[in-house]
Regions:
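Mature N-terminal segment immediately following signal peptide/propeptide cleavage
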Residues: 2-37
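Short, surface-exposed beta-strand/loop micro-motifs that present aromatic residues
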Residues: 11-13, 21-27, 190-195, 245-253
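Beta-sheet entry/capping signal
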Residues: 21-22, 201-203, 260, 327-329
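Active-site-adjacent, His/Asp/Glu-enriched structural segments that form or flank metal-binding
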Residues: 30-32, 40-155, 173, 183, ...
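Scaffold signal of the M16-like zinc-metallopeptidase fold and its non-catalytic homologs
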Residues: 64-66, 91-96, 112-119, 123, ...
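An aromatic/glycine/proline-enriched structural segment found at the starts
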Residues: 203-259, 368, 372-378
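Extended non-catalytic domains of envelope/secretory-pathway proteins
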Residues: 213, 282-283, 287, 328-333, ...
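Structured mid-domain segments that build the active-site/substrate or prosthetic-cofactor binding neighborhood
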Residues: 261, 268, 280-360
């Protein structure tokens, strides 16, 4: 058994009786500002067929009125203290999660912390979801769907069905279907909200030039009234099966100006419970080295004027859209008329790495670059503006075991909408 990963003692972590988890950290860069996040550990993959698009729709509705901030109150309140809608105030829905952020909040404004925490609170459990507002938002979603209906999006949706046969990951893109968006009953959205927006699936992250003790006390007070539904539904993490024969998925679109070839070699994903010890860090380092060395090989090949591809990459990570399956992922952008040759080159390089590994000099170059980037990150850790997002990703989304954190302790998303 490897020892646990050392945790940052400056991150205050707690869990309320209702199941909500919070992460709070002081960081004085930028000075006088703070970031507030709420993570919902649910996304479009949990939608039933007649709910496709509701996770994303609900995200939009969070800016259309809450109990304490009716109408346009959320936006008006935050803009009054210097937070800009879109730039500082935003949200996203992905297949597995939904995240809301309030960034660059000036701490010099009286009541700013309270306002932001109450907005997070109302997003978590006090949306109004008025019928008239829902109907207005249907048109907004339609326009977003129209703008996102690109050749790449259409092809991705087409191949996903083949890559995930009989699996929700094959058709649960956050934007949903316009048939559902146009016709779902008002109560369907309210039922979805009450079923899934609940404390055990939520996390609060506050990072910035703050007093940690004061913010923690406010979180405990403000969020304590959130309640769990009776007989809460299980949050299922849908597995992805292996396939006995290679899956070949082809898609074409008249608007797509160049081709892309992907190769995936699936393997088991790292279980969440195994992500809290040093073995996971060692594996993460090995993956980083693999990606850098493969990247160097592919870049060198692409520089040859006779190369059949313009660019290529190989790494190890998630299998396309699914967090529940890992894969060695490779892609190339072939030159015109050279798709088969480019595919063969990619496959050859993946096999060469598998069978023969890498040279010592390749490893030393990759390691030197990696250590240099680590040193830079360490030296700039106090100035890292995205610290709140890092905490969110590592702890809230990778489900680091809470009981391993201790009472004092303690980051594309794919297919975003």
């Amino acid at each position: 058994q490897m020892p646990p990963i050392p945790m940052d003692p400056n991150v205050r972590v707690g869990k309320l009786e209702n199941g909500l988890t919070y992460y709070i950290r002081h960081n004085n860069y930028p000075e006088g500002q703070a970031n507030f996040y709420i993570a919902q550990k649910v996304g479009s993959v949990i939608e039933e067929e007649n709910q496709r698009g509701l996770a994303h729709f609900l995200e939009h509705m969070c800016f259309n009125g809450t109990e304490k901030f009716p109408g346009n109150g959320v936006v008006k309140n935050l803009e009054s203290i210097g937070v800009k809608f879109g730039a500082d105030l935003n949200a996203y829905t992905s297949i597995d999660e939904t995240v809301y952020n309030i960034d660059n909040v000036p701490m010099s404004v009286a009541g700013a912390v309270d306002s932001c925490l109450w907005i997070l609170h109302d997003w978590a459990g006090a949306l109004l979801l008025e019928d008239e507002d829902i109907d207005k938002e249907r048109g907004v979603i339609h326009e977003e769907w129209r703008q996102r209906n690109t050749a790449q999006q259409r092809m991705m949706e087409a191949v996903a069905k083949k890559m995930y046969p009989g699996n929700r990951y094959g058709d649960r893109f956050p934007i949903g279907t316009m048939e559902v968006v146009d016709n779902f009953p008002y109560q369907a959205l309210k039922d979805y909200y009450e079923k899934w927006y609940r404390p055990d699936q939520q996390a609060i992250v506050v990072v910035g030039d703050i007093n940690v003790d004061e913010v923690e006390a406010k979180v405990k007070s403000i969020f304590a009234d959130l309640t769990m539904p009776e007989n809460p539904a299980e949050r299922v993490y849908y597995p992805v099966a292996d396939n006995k024969e290679p899956i070949i998925a082809l898609a074409q679109d008249k608007e797509q100006q160049y081709g892309i070839v992907y190769l995936f070699a699936k393997h088991e994903a790292i279980p969440n419970e195994a992500k809290g010890d040093m073995q996971y860090l060692i594996l993460d380092y090995a993956k980083a080295m693999f990606a850098q060395m493969m990247g160097a090989r592919m870049n060198e090949l692409a520089m040859d004027p006779d190369a059949p591809f313009v660019e290529g990459m190989v790494n190890d990570g998630e299998f396309f859209l699914a967090k529940t399956k890992g894969a060695v992922n490779g892609y190339v952008v072939p030159k015109g008329g050279m798709t088969m040759e480019a595919t063969a080159t990619l496959y050859r390089e993946m096999l060469r790495a598998q069978r023969h590994g890498f040279t010592e000099s390749e490893y030393e170059r990759a390691r030197a670059g990696y250590l240099s980037s680590l040193e830079s990150a360490f030296n700039e850790r106090r100035q890292k503006f995205s610290l709140a997002l890092d905490i969110l990703v590592v702890l809230a989304f990778y489900h680091y075991p809470y009981d391993r954190l201790g009472s004092g302790r303690s980051d594309n998303h794919s297919a975003l909408a």
